[in-house]
């Protein structure tokens, strides 16, 4: 595979290999047959990052080969959304003849949405001044006139210049409802929107008919908690990153959801609060004991859950666990399977043509 050519004819084989690998990893835990959710075979990534190569008067996007570290010129990138592919040549064509915009530009990041909005971040090895802002505004206006719904950001050491705003608003159709999600530049968002929709709908189906409240750790911008709110009395969700918490609060209001409470704290801190080990000012006005959480939802980073959080999670009757690293999931399941059984297993092909897998398990406590 090269950045400009996807092995589309191999898609089914690579998905079958992942499915078999997941079966093998989950076999020790008596997991059921996985439900498998396919990705679009091209234009599935909603974001992309490119280094910029200066070659005389020429300017082009490059990536580096992971094995050889050689640079590869990238004029089109079929893994990325069609919107990013349309924008890439127009962006370079506008920057190339402008010495103010191109000087010491070393990277361009794109974040696009199914709703048609896109953020472009230009990264520089130099200070950005008022002259840069004037030229950047002209670039933004030129691309807007070409029909792009675009936000432009300049970044340099300890500098972030936002011409208008640093976010886009995504709209995802989830089980009959359009969900609005504010996505902030340089914050985590699910890279594959089509697969994200399938993940949300699987989680909704897995928790249908739930009783009581939902606790979510690592909620990000509220991707799962807002979609799942319709299945629960109330949702209590934690997140540590300030921009993600702010986006989640906006998303709650934008979707007119009234039963979700977001608190800014790490999963480890929340564990201490639940166990009564520490008190936190951030929890003033929130009565943790009033929540009857029968279900806990976790979507941890690649490192998985730490030992203390595994113990916290294990106390809940139902656990919904989304993992971007089945190896750390397997490690956590060694403990969780002592008390819980896997009722559902899913493979989400979030990262086609790579060895990476995203998966989901629903666990229920044995009686």
Swiss-Prot record:
Top-level enzyme category: transferase
Q: Which reaction does it catalyse?
A: uridine(54) in tRNA + S-adenosyl-L-methionine = 5-methyluridine(54) in tRNA + S-adenosyl-L-homocysteine + H(+); uridine(341) in tmRNA + S-adenosyl-L-methionine = 5-methyluridine(341) in tmRNA + S-adenosyl-L-homocysteine + H(+)
The family note in this entry says:
Belongs to the class I-like SAM-binding methyltransferase superfamily. RNA M5U methyltransferase family. TrmA subfamily.
Reported function: Dual-specificity methyltransferase that catalyzes the formation of 5-methyluridine at position 54 (m5U54) in all tRNAs, and that of position 341 (m5U341) in tmRNA (transfer-mRNA).
Encoding gene (name): trmA
Q: Which GO terms describe its cellular component?
A: cytosol
NCBIfam families under this entry? trmA_only
Q: Which InterPro entries does the protein's record reference?
A: MeTrfase_TrmA_AS, MeTrfase_TrmA_CS, SAM-dependent_MTases_sf, TrmA_MeTrfase, U5_MeTrfase_fam
What domain of life? Bacteria
Enzyme Commission number, as recorded: 2.1.1.-, 2.1.1.35
Which residues constitute the catalytic centre? 324, 358
Name of the protein in its database record: tRNA/tmRNA (uracil-C(5))-methyltransferase
- A single MF term (Gene Ontology): rRNA binding
Q: Which UniProt keywords apply?
A: Methyltransferase, S-adenosyl-L-methionine, Transferase, tRNA processing
Please provide an example of a Pfam family that matches this protein in its UniProt record: tRNA_U5-meth_tr
Which BP terms does GO give this entry?
tRNA methylation
Q: Where does S-adenosyl-L-methionine bind?
A: 190, 218, 223, 239, 299
């Amino acid at each position: 595979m090269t950045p400009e050519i996807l092995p589309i004819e191999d898609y089914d084989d690579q998905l079958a290999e992942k499915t078999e690998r997941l079966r093998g990893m989950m076999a020790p835990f008596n997991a059921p047959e996985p439900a498998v959710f396919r990705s679009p075979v091209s234009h599935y990534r909603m974001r992309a990052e490119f280094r910029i190569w200066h070659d005389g008067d020429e300017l082009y996007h490059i990536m580096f080969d992971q094995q050889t570290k050689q640079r590869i010129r990238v004029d089109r990138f079929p893994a990325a959304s069609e919107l990013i592919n349309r924008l890439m040549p127009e962006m370079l064509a506008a920057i190339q003849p402008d010495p103010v915009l191109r000087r010491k530009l070393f990277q361009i990041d794109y974040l696009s949405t199914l709703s048609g909005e896109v953020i472009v971040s230009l990264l520089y090895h130099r200070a950005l001044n008022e002259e840069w802002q004037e030229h950047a505004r002209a670039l933004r206006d030129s691309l807007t006139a070409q029909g792009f719904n675009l936000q432009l950001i300049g970044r340099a050491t300890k500098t972030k210049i936002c011409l208008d705003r640093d976010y886009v608003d995504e709209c995802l159709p989830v089980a009959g409802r359009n969900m609005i999600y504010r996505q902030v530049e340089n914050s985590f968002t699910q890279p594959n929107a089509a697969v994200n929709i399938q993940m949300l709908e699987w989680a909704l189906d897995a928790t249908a008919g739930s009783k009581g409240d939902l606790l979510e750790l690592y909620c990000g911008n509220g991707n799962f908690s807002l979609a799942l709110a319709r299945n629960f009395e109330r949702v209590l969700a934690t997140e540590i990153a300030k921009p993600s918490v702010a986006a989640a609060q906006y998303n709650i209001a934008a979707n007119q959801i009234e039963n979700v409470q977001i608190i800014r704290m790490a999963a480890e801190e929340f564990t201490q609060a639940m166990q009564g080990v520490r008190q936190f000012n951030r929890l003033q006005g929130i009565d943790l004991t009033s929540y009857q959480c029968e279900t806990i939802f976790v979507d941890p980073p690649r490192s998985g859950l730490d030992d203390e959080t595994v113990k916290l999670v294990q106390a809940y009757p139902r656990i919904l666990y989304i993992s971007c690293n089945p190896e750390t999931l397997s490690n956590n399941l060694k403990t969780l399977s002592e008390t819980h059984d896997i009722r559902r297993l899913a493979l989400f092909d979030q990262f086609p043509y790579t060895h990476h897998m995203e998966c989901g398990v629903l666990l229920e406590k044995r009686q």
